[in-house]
From Swiss-Prot:
Site note Important for stereospecificity with the R-enantiomer, residues: 27
Lineage: Bacteria, environmental samples
Encoding gene, per UniProt annotation: phnZ
GO molecular function, one term: oxidoreductase activity
Name this protein carries in UniProt: 2-amino-1-hydroxyethylphosphonate dioxygenase (glycine-forming)
Reaction it catalyzes: (1R)-(2-amino-1-hydroxyethyl)phosphonate + O2 = glycine + phosphate + 2 H(+)
Keyword Metal-binding: yes
Keyword field: Hydrolase, Iron, Metal-binding, Oxidoreductase
Chain sites annotated for binding (1R)-(2-amino-1-hydroxyethyl)phosphonate: 27, 62, 108, 126-133, 158
InterPro entries per record: HD/PDEase_dom, HD_domain, HDIG_dom, OP_Dioxygenase
Length: 190
């Protein structure tokens, strides 16, 4: 028996709420606050709903499964971008949302390799996870990444990811995104 779109969204909201208890490793906020801030910045910038949802759910792979995935030395789930994207594909989210989520780690690797100042501005935790994520891209990887149709959108997700680490920022809670998620799932049904 498959879940209704409303039930799928309730599961996601429950996962988001539970992430309140998870440290956003190396930062002064929790995982929920980070996710909500990223979505807030996306929405405030005028991004479309798929971008807002990708920003909201980009770190879902750290906490969407009860099973144990390979760890990045205490810095979260290795390949969390793929774990989260695949989880959302299974729920019926669009390929664009999944690809944007997969692309946020590649965007970090790209920016580190193409902007000397970017690495200096990363938090200690983000620098540490970069090692597990493949380090800076080489020239060939950069060219391939730049050829992606969603290249610029992946960089935007990454920018919101970096910005979404503020303490005491008041933003809407997970329920604010319920209707957006339900409509997205309805639009993407075959």
């Amino acid at each position: 028996m498959s879940l209704s779109n409303s039930s799928k969204v309730s599961v996601l909201i429950s996962l988001l709420e539970k992430s309140r208890d998870l440290d956003y490793i190396g930062e002064a906020i929790n995982q929920l606050e980070h996710s909500l801030q990223c979505a807030y910045f996306a929405q405030r910038s005028g991004a479309d709903n798929e971008m807002v949802l990708a920003a909201l759910l980009h770190d879902l792979g750290h906490y969407c499964n009860d099973t144990s995935f390979e760890d990045m030395g205490g810095y979260g789930v290795w390949q969390h971008e793929k774990v989260g994207a695949d989880y959302l594909r299974g729920l019926g989210f669009s390929e664009r949302v999944a690809c944007l989520i997969e692309g946020h780690v590649a965007a970090k690797r790209y920016l580190v390799s193409s902007k000397a100042s970017y690495l200096k501005n990363l938090s200690d935790a983000s620098r540490k996870t970069l090692e597990y994520q493949g380090g800076p891209m080489d020239e060939g990887e950069r060219r391939l990444f730049e050829e992606r149709e969603d290249f610029k959108d992946c960089l935007k997700i990454r920018a919101w990811d970096e910005k979404g680490k503020q303490t005491d920022l008041k933003v809407p809670g997970p329920e604010h995104y319920r209707k957006m998620m339900e409509e997205h799932l309805s639009e993407n049904q075959n």
